[in-house]
């Protein structure tokens, strides 16, 4: 195909495509790939004023599943295209046209490529993408991994995510993903663990805290619902993803940030490393609150698994639920331990959110959460170190009763708490005479 660089040629070609003929549409797509002059001529011929609005509208399109209009759009803004400003206005400011939601992965990929071409080096467009109603809608479309989990995504998605996360407003993307669902949130945290280089930066730290805060809140809510109505396969799938997000998020903190000194300060400066920043108490507050709440729900709803009694599950559904949250309680305690080891104000926040006694109560063996006892002991030490108020809470705790054990019953023993607050183990007959 020869280069078409005249407006007249493009007007004729665009006019002949009104019936959506596949061959003509491919000629347009390939023609736009020829470069700057072809793109400009197509724009002058009405690519954005007539052609694309017509073919993007499902009611007049011969095939709403065709990816050709989307590929034409992507090619029209590729490289140093002179149509980028017009294309951006077409997406963001067009009151007469509403971009349809992609119907298949090919359409979505073309939209992603076009969007990346438009924001790759333009900070103003990036700002508008993250702060306008139209921009948030676009982000909600391309970052929706929950509606179409089987769609394959191109590496350009990582580029878009990295561009936004490294900007001054990474929380926008976290908020968008959290409103969509756990698979979309998981994509972000997975990006950070493999593709996106945010380690040892304030941005990466804040993103992880934001993710854990959002997930903690949603995770606790979904768990509570599981005990009020039948557990659905979709609900169980969400819980599995929430569990993975919590464990991966906490692991990222330890992998990328644990090496810093205890006295760490943070400020909102993307170029600085954690060790150089001033810390504001409000930053980890939400994540601490939500993770403590999640831990409380898990502690209430998920029984400990011990060598004596392997499980308390009364149904296969509950057994699947318990398996889905294996290790989450441990990671919640591990997160609190990390925050307390880094920030001197964190133990006070844990106390404020009623987490001190909760952390101490995790210092038991639990096969669902290997090493939770040891991590809880470490976390308790961090909570009490040079903190008189937390020490008072510990001093005021008294044992209430012992837990039932079938193994002790079968062996003819029982346990109780004596007047001095000590646990006593003795034969049943001796207890009765006592």
Swiss-Prot record:
Q: Its induction, per UniProt?
A: Expression is up-regulated during meiosis.
List the InterPro entries hit by this protein, alphabetically: Ataxin-10/CTR86_families, Ataxin-10_domain
Keyword set for this entry? Cell cycle, Cell division, Cytoplasm, Meiosis, Nucleus
Question: What's the superkingdom here?
Answer: Eukaryota
Per the record, the GO terms for biological process are: cell division; meiotic cell cycle; regulation of cytokinesis
What's the main place this protein lives? cytoplasm
Gene Ontology cellular component? cytosol; nucleus
Write out the annotated subcellular location: Cytoplasm; Nucleus
Q: What does this protein do?
A: May play a role in the regulation of cytokinesis.
| Family, per entry | Belongs to the ataxin-10 family.
Return the PANTHER family for the record: ATAXIN-10 (PTHR13255:SF0)
Protein name, UniProt field: Ataxin-10 homolog
Protein's gene: mug160
């Amino acid at each position: 195909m020869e280069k078409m660089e005249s407006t007249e040629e493009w007007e004729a070609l665009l006019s002949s495509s009104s019936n959506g003929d596949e061959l003509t549409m491919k000629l347009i797509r390939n023609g736009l790939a020829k470069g700057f002059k072809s793109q400009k001529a197509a724009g002058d011929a009405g690519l954005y004023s007539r052609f694309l609005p017509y073919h993007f509208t499902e009611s007049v399109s011969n095939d709403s599943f065709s990816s050709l209009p989307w590929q034409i759009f992507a090619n029209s803004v590729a490289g140093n295209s002179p149509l980028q400003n017009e294309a951006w206005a077409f997406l963001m400011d067009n009151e007469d046209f509403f971009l349809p939601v992609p119907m298949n992965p090919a359409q979505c990929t073309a939209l992603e490529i076009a969007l990346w071409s438009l924001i790759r080096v333009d900070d103003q467009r990036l700002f508008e993408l993250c702060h306008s109603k139209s921009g948030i809608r676009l982000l909600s479309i391309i970052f929706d991994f929950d509606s179409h989990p089987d769609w394959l995504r191109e590496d350009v998605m990582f580029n878009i995510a990295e561009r936004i996360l490294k900007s001054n407003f990474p929380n926008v993307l976290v908020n968008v993903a959290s409103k969509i669902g756990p698979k979309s949130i998981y994509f972000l945290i997975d990006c950070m663990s493999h593709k996106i280089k945010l380690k040892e930066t304030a941005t990466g730290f804040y993103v992880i805290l934001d993710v854990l805060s959002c997930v903690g809140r949603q995770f606790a809510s979904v768990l509570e619902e599981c005990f009020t109505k039948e557990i659905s396969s979709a609900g169980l799938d969400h819980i599995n993803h929430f569990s993975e997000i919590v464990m991966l998020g906490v692991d990222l903190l330890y992998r990328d940030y644990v090496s810093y000194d205890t006295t760490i300060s943070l400020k909102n400066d993307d170029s600085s490393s954690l060790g150089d920043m001033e810390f504001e108490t409000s930053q980890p507050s939400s994540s601490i609150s939500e993770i403590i709440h999640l831990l409380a729900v898990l502690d209430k709803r998920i029984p400990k698994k011990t060598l004596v009694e392997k499980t308390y599950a009364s149904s296969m559904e509950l057994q699947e639920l318990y398996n889905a949250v294996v290790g989450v309680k441990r990671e919640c305690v591990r997160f609190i331990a990390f925050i307390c080891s880094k920030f001197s104000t964190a133990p006070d926040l844990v106390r404020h959110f009623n987490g001190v006694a909760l952390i101490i109560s995790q210092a038991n063996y639990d096969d669902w959460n290997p090493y939770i006892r040891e991590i809880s002991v470490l976390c308790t030490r961090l909570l009490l170190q040079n903190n008189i108020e937390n020490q008072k809470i510990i001093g005021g705790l008294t044992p209430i009763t012992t837990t039932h054990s079938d193994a002790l019953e079968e062996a003819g023993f029982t346990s109780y708490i004596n007047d001095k607050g000590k646990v006593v183990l003795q034969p049943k007959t001796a207890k009765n005479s006592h």
